[in-house]
Regions:
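Secreted, disulfide-rich extracellular signaling modules
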Residues: 2-406
Length: 406
């Protein structure tokens, strides 16, 4: 009996090798592009699932400046557009119409190692009343409370823009000092700790970056220590002046040049499904008869296992107010038969080949192999949180690039 079994396997293997050399008709390789308007129930289900994949428990509702971008999202847009072309081929690349903030080489290096980047807007709206000695000091505060627990900051920068001072001599210099606020008092000025001082030329123009990595980690681990920053500017003669006189742009300056903070994070892989979505899986399955699946739109003519096109539009989901980029991405999906013989283009595993042969002899007990992704790629999503901070996050295994029989 054993010899007959192996003889049959040998015969089927020979037939498989002969069939694998055949070439598909080119029409079979044409993508099946699915695009239709979602029904309300489908839309809600898709919104829940995608929010779960993005690691969000609700839809962010940021407070925006009449649709205008300030410096923080523009900087993040530049980071987003600096992603690899391989990754961006699966998404709609966002082209900014504004003058952007030009990330430094150091920022791009941080981006390469980071899984998430967050920018933070300055929360100070009105200058507090300071003593005459510090009347020209300016303060900045950033809310780091929304950072997920357990995520470490690998790099952080305070960025402030300096314009050319035309009314001053080109050789004139200013001393810019950045301080950490370490203590507050009701009856006197705050206690300051000098982080860095830098000599600036009057004719100098561009973004100034200050490393606050250690300080940011302190703020995350000990929120009570997050009392913000202060800056001061002195002339070469030692006189304290308004930072604006040295060309430093404050919160009343152009939106695209306002100061902000950016932090780079190394995070663990996002859980594909949260407890919420697992708990509702049974309910979703009970309602499945009322929702047409992708297979329903592609089951009339079953073809061999291959990749099919599927585009997810964030705009169609009504998320264009909080997702900056991309407008959508080509998620794609795998569908088709893994029937004998398995052609070479099916990317079948050795196990799938054997399973197919055994299925032919015992179809009741051994199922056919499944058509599943063999290559998945990441995408990056740029979005606002509830505090109008901008987050750039990489999400793994979001795009199907190849399919095969498993």
């Amino acid at each position: 009996m054993t010899s007959i079994w192996f003889a049959l396997l040998g015969f089927l293997w020979t037939v498989y090798l002969a069939g694998s050399s055949s070439v598909l008709d080119p029409s079979e390789l044409q993508p099946n592009f699915i695009h239709r308007r979602l029904h309300s129930q489908e839309k809600r289900e898709m919104q829940k699932e995608i929010l779960s994949i993005l690691g969000l428990n609700h839809r962010p509702r940021p407070h925006l400046n009449n649709g205008k971008y300030n410096s923080a999202p523009l900087f993040m847009l530049d980071l987003y557009n600096s992603m690899s072309t391989e990754e961006k081929s699966d998404v709609d690349q966002y082209r900014s119409l504004f003058t952007t903030t030009r990330p430094t080489l150091a920022s791009l290096e941080f981006l390469h190692d980071a899984d998430m980047v967050m920018s933070f807007v300055n929360l100070v709206e009105n200058d507090r009343e300071l003593s005459p000695q510090r009347r020209h000091y300016r303060e900045y505060k950033f809310n780091l409370s929304q950072i997920p627990e357990g995520e470490a900051i690998t790099a952080a920068e305070f960025r402030i823009y300096k314009e050319c001072v035309t009314r001053a001599s080109r050789n004139e210099t200013f001393l810019l000092s950045v301080f950490q606020v370490v203590g507050e008092h009701p009856d006197r000025d705050v206690d300051l700790f000098l982080l860095e001082s830098r000599r600036l030329w009057a004719a100098e123009e561009g973004w100034l970056e200050f490393d606050i990595t250690a300080l940011s980690n302190l703020w995350v681990t000990s929120p009570l220590h997050n009392l913000g920053l202060q800056i001061s500017v002195e002339t070469s003669s030692g006189w304290s002046i308004n930072p604006k006189e040295a060309g430093l742009v404050g919160r009343y300056g152009a939106l695209e040049r306002q100061p902000f903070m950016v932090a780079f994070f190394k995070v663990s892989e996002v859980r594909v499904r949260t407890g919420r979505s697992v708990g509702k899986r049974r309910q979703t399955n009970r309602n499945r008869s009322n929702i047409r699946t992708l297979g329903d739109y592609n089951s009339d003519q079953k073809t061999a296992c291959r990749k099919h096109e599927l585009y997810v539009s964030f705009r169609e989901l009504g998320w264009q107010d909080w997702i900056i980029a991309p407008e959508g991405y080509a998620a794609n999906y795998c569908d088709g038969e893994c029937s004998f013989p398995l052609n070479a283009h099916m990317n079948a595993t050795n196990h799938a080949i054997v399973q197919t042969l055994v299925h032919l002899m015992n179809p009741q007990n051994v199922p056919k192999p499944c058509c599943a992704p063999t290559k998945l790629h990441a995408i990056s999503v740029l979005y606002y949180d509830d505090n109008s901070n901008v987050i750039l996050k990489k999400y793994k295994n979001m795009v199907v690039r190849a399919c095969g029989c498993h």
